[in-house]
């Protein structure tokens, strides 16, 4: 799980980005590769080939990578770093469904390998709309690119961006195509949340500190809340988002991964498969959701006009590209229960949405109150539950909330914070998530990536919810004002179970 300080001793590598002229390359992938190079973490011979349908010259693509990195990188890239890579950056124009274009790409890779007289590792990064995942994967297989140096330390690898399907059936279909062309050890399904420092540290906090693991169970935990909220609307992604929605776009991947890491049992080792095995077991322990009736465990909503940060915001149906009869949810919350020894009876509350009160991603573990023998009888004590808040963004860090006596002649209680912030402790220039994930993929370490059965298990839980909502049409799609924390029914979901949402009050 821990990356080496340098991998310059590894074989030459070619990174091929499909969809290279897109926004992800400009904002994340280009800057990540150049930052890895600046830290001497790339192989000595490293090449970057952009692949796309546009006719772009090598010089134009180099300028695109350099300029976008200057704009989006977490730090200034040295001229020396750029010069060392510049001549190795090129662009290959081609179609995603034309096999001949993939043969041409293969010939380009062969020529580089012949020039170096050394076996080359290929890392194919699929950064395209999901509609072209299938032809890219099929043509990587048919052209022989997927099988290059199979079962050797330089075998080809492929990174696939989410979404990993739209439901269980499509996830199964995608995995079938992947498994037909690649071995699972070659496949890296990427969720950039897993590359964030706080998420990486979650297993360390749980299993390297004896104060947490003994109380990390149903005997001491009252509830777990996971929030991934955004204060922005759909902006220019209206067309894509309306085909997706909050459940598909955020909960099925980001939020469910956070749940798995929070709830999983200790792995037998830090080996990638040991960790991923336990994540799958945690997901498999989740009970099917109750989708209707008085005990329903799901809520959905759509934002209407409101105020966000003091400015007027339009409603979802007024956004560009959104049909007036849309039934897509921009907010979803769930109450999940686990059928296992550790978590039996502990609700896991999940929520995600757009145009909410603030941008925040965090896990809140609420512990049970102590017996109200000493401090619970008198209201002046104001006994609050202990909370462990794991902030993923913004301001990555961990805060433990405890009760303490306030100064004075009377015994009065007040919650206090024991806080740790990554930036305060380690400085602000920590690596971006994509840097860690690309480096791990180059090293063949799948710890922070999603395995095929993980994706299928998650979809197996959520597909019945999507089917129910589709059949209900607009019934139950509750409106909430932009700038609030979502539908009223989301509050009732917790209140009816003896809890309330904790995120967004005095945290973040």
Regions flagged by a language model, labelled:
Residues 1-160, 164-508:
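Secretory/organelle targeting and membrane-embedding segments
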